[in-house]
Amino acid sequence: MATINQLVRQPRKRIVEKSDVPALQNCPQRRGVCTRVYTTTPKKPNSALRKVCRVRLTNGFEVSSYIGGEGHNLQEHSVVLIRGGRVKDLPGVRYHTVRGSLDTSGVKGRNQGRSKYGTKRPK
């Protein structure tokens, strides 16, 4: 336990919480332009070709973003919306692209969990 004199000389430090998504700068989403669209393989126990794009955000950050869902229409210079949320088996991928907004199309033929993939309600 610190004495009162010690606390007067050097007060207690506040613990600063580190952000999981620093590039968003406390915003819910950010807009950006794709600089590279590619596939990459996940960490050890899993096996797949995960779709990822490198995005230059409007605030100057350059981040990797995961493209969820089956099939996508993104290419270089596509304008995308980025939200937070990491992909556990892809190191360095801490953001998701928002499907169905800006240049990103929704997932075709999706009937369940449609709101997460930007799919309109089937007639």
From Swiss-Prot:
SUPFAM superfamilies: Nucleic acid-binding proteins. GO terms for molecular function: rRNA binding; structural constituent of ribosome; tRNA binding. Keywords: Methylation, Ribonucleoprotein, Ribosomal protein, RNA-binding, rRNA-binding, tRNA-binding. Residues 111-123 have a biased composition (Basic residues). Signal peptide: none annotated. One of its GO terms (cellular component) is small ribosomal subunit. One of its GO terms (biological process) is translation. InterPro entries: NA-bd_OB-fold, Ribosomal_uS12, Ribosomal_uS12_bac. The keyword Metal-binding does not apply. Residues 100-123 are annotated as: Disordered. The modification 3-methylthioaspartic acid is found at residue 89. With S4 and S5 plays an important role in translational accuracy. Interacts with and stabilizes bases of the 16S rRNA that are involved in tRNA selection in the A site and with the mRNA backbone. Located at the interface of the 30S and 50S subunits, it traverses the body of the 30S subunit contacting proteins on the other side and probably holding the rRNA structure together. The combined cluster of proteins S8, S12 and S17 appears to hold together the shoulder and platform of the 30S subunit. NCBIfam families: rpsL_bact. Belongs to the universal ribosomal protein uS12 family. Part of the 30S ribosomal subunit. Contacts proteins S8 and S17. May interact with IF1 in the 30S initiation complex. This is Small ribosomal subunit protein uS12. It comes from Pseudomonas fluorescens (strain Pf0-1). The lineage of its organism: Bacteria, Pseudomonadati, Pseudomonadota, Gammaproteobacteria, Pseudomonadales.
